[in-house]
């Protein structure tokens, strides 16, 4: 055993052993309890960042711990390999996205291996490979035939110069990010998953996920957005509209119907189109609305604009004429593309009515207090629907609470055939068509005679050609007759293959299930293997995936269940959302007001007595730089630390130890070079103690019955550490406090007596415990030390240590003694001592006698096992 800790040598040795022995290869063992631990798979961007390292280390620690508990553990890894960054990189470097992607995968895989992750690489999936996406296409055809996938027109951002559809984030100030062209809203045919058909189940089954953070479940509940309300029909004013009909609106507040003063429709609504026929100004406004963003977030923050039409509808209860306005905040794809406006009690309508001088009618008032209604100032209570308000100015519906008004107005509307109670969801169907190249081809053939025909199963996969270099204009597949020209599977006539590809969220919605049977060729999933492994016992990923990815994966799991592919209802039993990795930022302001960001490694800092950074200068020129505070590690702020350089300098174990020790996994982790050095120092201490112990020759067995008091204290420290770490790692995932418990134990072992065989046998037990408790966290050093401590089997196959409760029993206890709440000494008493004996010992303590001299003792407070406080005056 080398005297010095040499991480490179140690880590190579451990990794070679795992490779040679296929230590991480796993099979279904029906008689063994399984544990499926999964970290969200990465996009192969080129190299790992610290966020990846943290995510995968957390997963690896949990996996290795459960393996030590005797479970059959699956920890797979793969690549979320389709997507826009590959297309952008391809255009920049003039290389096919496939080649760029596969090169990145090879490099990132070597980085993951260097971290020592216990991954079963035989189950690797790469989503851009046909053997993966063929099953996605197969499921698509099944769902299309059932109507769970359908085609309809959808509104998109269209770049007229690049002839392509842009994602919302690619539209900057209304212009295309690449071409700079003014973006248009366009209606194009798109494919949709009918996720709304599962809205109720997706909402209700959140209650069956006690292992998920409440915050994530709340975010999903809000996104699904179930609301109870009414669909109300406003009869057309035939004099202005020219024919009979109804404008249908959905509202959650029918109790305020008597306050409706106008209605607003979306730019795409048929009434808007009709009104604009002889009104060029209105047509210009409608065109402007259509050019706006299509994202709800954009619409929520943009300035509310509208224009009156010459059309009217009738109030369903009073018959009053209400003007029809076109407004940019009304979405055609929400409800019927129309809203009833009650400016008195809806903040958005209030703002709009004040802007355009529309009537504002109060129909709700506070029950108590003198807070008057003012039509010029919005107050929070205007929108209330609790016991604090009642209806007013509502005729026969006056003096009613929310529910009573809802019911009374609802009953009258239903009687007139102008309303019905309805439950609505905020959730929209999932549009998955993308006019992109680097994605999974949609398996549909368009035939003039037969319509949209799914590609038959025996003709799948529809393979994406991998040698294409996109140029950014239009869809490359739409320019490739060799791809799209085909014959109709139904009638044999010439037909055209669909050239859109699927949203990349589709691939990440079922990958967790394919890991159960990645080589299975008989179907999307091998039901037996899928039911053995699923659901995932522990899923780990960032909170930023709380809604879309996690909701789509839950939806897909239910689709697969309904296809008979899996037996469970939910994909992920427990969810851990790890915090971000943050680091200091430094910058200089440029002449044009921008910022040049400098990497912390290139900056020299000055700290105050509390180690806070108070000054910074660039190493290269010695000139000051501004301190930007701590931010998430990112390329844009240039504050990332390359994991590879850390591994090369300190070794993977140091990197892993720092990551797990610096903060609990669900909190942000602040990068600290000093913290990394501290982690490395600790591992050197462990190595040093083990080296000294092993060099003296391994001891014989420990005789637990023959321990003296000092030895009992050492053994107690060993088993306290086991108890603490078992709770922290196994139950709470608080790896930082588990590591702290091992550090405390190391302090005891370094000071422990080392005189005789019993002492040495005790240190042996202590070192074995240190190695076993650290094995999931720092597996390489523990692999080598376990062998050096005399074990033939590798630590990867060792069991987690169990607590010897008898070692925790103390014959004597040391209690703190206070006088008037101030520490004045310690006393040793028998563990079985009565309260009277403890009080007598405390009163007899020489310090107590000194500090109570001349005082009378009023009372003595005894906290069993901890302290005695003597109150005297």
Swiss-Prot record:
EC number(s) recorded for this UniProt protein: 6.1.1.4
Cystine residue pairs: none
Main location: cytoplasm
Transmembrane region(s): none
GO molecular function, one term: ATP binding
Enzyme class: ligase
Region (Disordered): 624-643
Single GO cellular component term: cytosol
Binding residues annotated for ATP, in chain numbering: 635
UniProt-recorded name of the protein: Leucine--tRNA ligase
């Amino acid at each position: 055993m080398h005297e010095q800790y040499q991480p490179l040598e140690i880590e190579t040795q451990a990794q070679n052993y795992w490779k040679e022995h296929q230590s991480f290869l796993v099979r279904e063992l029906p008689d063994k309890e399984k544990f499926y631990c999964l970290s969200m798979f990465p996009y192969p961007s080129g190299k790992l960042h610290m966020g990846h390292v943290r995510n995968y280390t957390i997963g690896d620690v949990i996996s290795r711990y459960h393996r030590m508990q005797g479970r059959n553990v699956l920890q797979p890894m793969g690549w979320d390999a389709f997507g826009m960054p590959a297309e952008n990189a391809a255009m920049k470097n003039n290389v096919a996205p496939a080649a760029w992607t596969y090169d990145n995968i090879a490099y990132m895989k070597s980085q993951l291996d260097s971290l020592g992750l216990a991954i079963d690489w035989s189950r690797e999936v790469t989503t851009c490979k046909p053997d993966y996406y063929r099953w996605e296409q197969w499921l698509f055809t099944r769902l299309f035939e059932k109507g769970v996938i359908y085609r309809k027109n959808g509104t998109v951002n269209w770049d007229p110069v690049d002839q392509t559809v842009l994602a919302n984030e690619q539209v900057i100030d209304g212009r295309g990010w690449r071409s700079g062209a003014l973006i248009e809203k366009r209606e194009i045919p798109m494919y949709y998953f009918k996720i709304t058909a599962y809205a109720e189940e997706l909402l209700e089954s959140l209650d069956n996920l006690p292992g998920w953070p409440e915050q994530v479940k709340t975010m999903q509940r809000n996104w699904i957005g179930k609301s109870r309300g009414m669909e109300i029909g406003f009869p057309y004013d035939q004099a202005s509209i020219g024919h009979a009909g109804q404008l249908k609106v959905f509202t959650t507040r029918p109790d305020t119907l008597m306050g409706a003063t106008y209605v607003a429709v979306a730019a795409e609504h048929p009434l808007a189109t009709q009104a604009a026929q002889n009104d060029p100004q209105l047509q210009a406004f409608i065109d402007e609305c259509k050019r706006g963003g299509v994202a709800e977030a954009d619409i929520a923050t943009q300035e509310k604009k509208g224009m009156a039409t010459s059309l009217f509808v009738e109030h369903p209860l009073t018959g009053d004429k209400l003007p029809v306005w076109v407004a940019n905040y009304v979405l055609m794809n929400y409800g019927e593309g129309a809203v009833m406006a009650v400016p008195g009690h809806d903040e958005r309508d209030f703002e709009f009515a004040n802007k355009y001088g529309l009537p504002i009618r109060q129909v709700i008032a506070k029950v108590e207090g003198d807070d008057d209604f003012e039509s010029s100032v919005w107050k929070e209570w205007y929108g209330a629907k609790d016991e604090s308000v009642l209806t007013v100015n509502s005729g026969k519906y006056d003096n009613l609470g929310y529910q009573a008004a809802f019911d009374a107005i609802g009953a009258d509307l239903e009687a007139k055939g102008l309303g019905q109670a309805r439950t609505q969801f905020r959730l929209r169907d999932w549009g998955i068509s993308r006019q992109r190249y680097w994605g999974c081809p949609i398996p549909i053939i368009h035939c003039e005679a037969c319509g949209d025909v799914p590609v038959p199963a025996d003709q799948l996969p529809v393979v994406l050609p991998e040698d294409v270099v996109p140029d950014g204009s239009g869809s490359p597949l739409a320019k490739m007759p060799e791809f799209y020209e085909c014959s109709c599977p139904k009638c044999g006539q010439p037909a055209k293959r669909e050239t859109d590809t699927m949203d990349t969220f589709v691939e990440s919605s079922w990958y967790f299930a394919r890991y159960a049977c990645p080589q299975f060729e008989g179907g999307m999933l091998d039901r037996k293997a899928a039911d053995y492994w699923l659901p995932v016992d522990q899923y780990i990923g960032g909170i930023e995936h709380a809604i879309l990815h996690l909701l789509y994966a839950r939806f897909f799991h239910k689709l697969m269940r309904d296809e008979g592919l899996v037996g469970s209802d939910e994909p992920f039993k427990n969810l851990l959302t790890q915090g971000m990795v943050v680091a200091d930022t430094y910058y200089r302001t440029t002449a044009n007001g921008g910022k040049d960001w400098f990497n912390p490694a290139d900056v020299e800092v000055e700290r105050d007595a509390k180690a806070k950074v108070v000054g910074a200068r660039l190493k290269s020129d010695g000139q000051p730089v501004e301190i930007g505070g701590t931010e998430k590690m990112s390329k844009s702020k240039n504050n990332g630390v390359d994991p590879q350089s850390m591994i090369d300098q300190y070794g993977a174990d140091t990197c892993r130890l720092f990551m797990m020790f610096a903060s609990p996994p669900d909190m942000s982790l602040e990068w600290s070079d000093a913290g990394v050095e501290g982690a490395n120092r600790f591992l050197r201490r462990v190595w040093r103690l083990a080296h000294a112990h092993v060099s003296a020759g391994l001891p014989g067995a420990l005789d637990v019955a023959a321990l003296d008091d000092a030895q009992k204290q050492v053994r107690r420290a060993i088993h306290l550490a086991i108890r603490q770490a078992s709770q922290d790692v196994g139950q709470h995932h608080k790896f930082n406090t588990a590591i702290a418990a091992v550090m405390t134990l190391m302090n005891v072992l370094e000071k422990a007596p080392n005189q005789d065989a019993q002492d040495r046998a005790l240190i042996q037990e202590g070192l074995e415990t240190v190695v076993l408790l650290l094995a999931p966290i720092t597996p390489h050093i523990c692999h080598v030390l376990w062998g050096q401590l005399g074990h033939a089997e590798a630590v990867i196959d060792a069991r987690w240590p169990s607590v010897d409760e008898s070692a925790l029993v103390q014959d004597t206890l040391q209690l703190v003694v206070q006088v008037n709440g101030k520490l004045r000494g310690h006393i040793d008493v028998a563990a079985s001592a009565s309260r009277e004996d403890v009080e007598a010992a405390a009163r007899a303590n020489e310090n107590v006698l000194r500090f109570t001299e001349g005082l009378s003792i009023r009372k003595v407070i005894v906290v069993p096992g901890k302290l005695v406080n003597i109150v005297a005056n």
